[in-house]
Amino acid sequence: GKDLAEISGMVCSRVTPGYLWVQGDDSYKVRAMTAEGKFSTTIKLHDSYRDWEGLSGGVYNDTNYLFVGVFGDNGLSYKDKYYIYYFEEPEVVDGEVKVEKKIIHFGYPDGKAHNAEVIMYDNIENKIYIVDKWNTFNSTGMVYSMPFSTDMDLETMHVLTEECQLGGNDM
């Protein structure tokens, strides 16, 4: 669709098999789509627009969640103002659905600005993983993590843990 000119995240629906959830970095919507590209459900997550990068899904305490990474930072100007939106995955229906969005606020252990691209959720360890873009000085990216629980909120800034470095041969 025109409102998703650049898809930045895609994950299979766990609630409605045969559908993908997709998200663009140029809108505030998550959409359900068939493999043939037919759009169905629209979830609007109203906020002041930021560079959305990455979408993941997973199960926590027998509930399916979707996670949206609000951490793209091409200008490296946000420093400690990075967020993850998460909400219970709805059933795919025609039209718009409303969800109760929760927000996790996080920063990086070095206290600097980063430009991340990927979010992943580990159902076994209940961890969120974030991968930042490579550093142009040494051509590496970094994988970070933080434990996930539904008690996390916007008021507390959670600091990521550095996991490992990625180079060109690792990807």
PLM segments and residue spans:
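Sequence/structural signature of beta-propeller domains
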Residues: 1-171
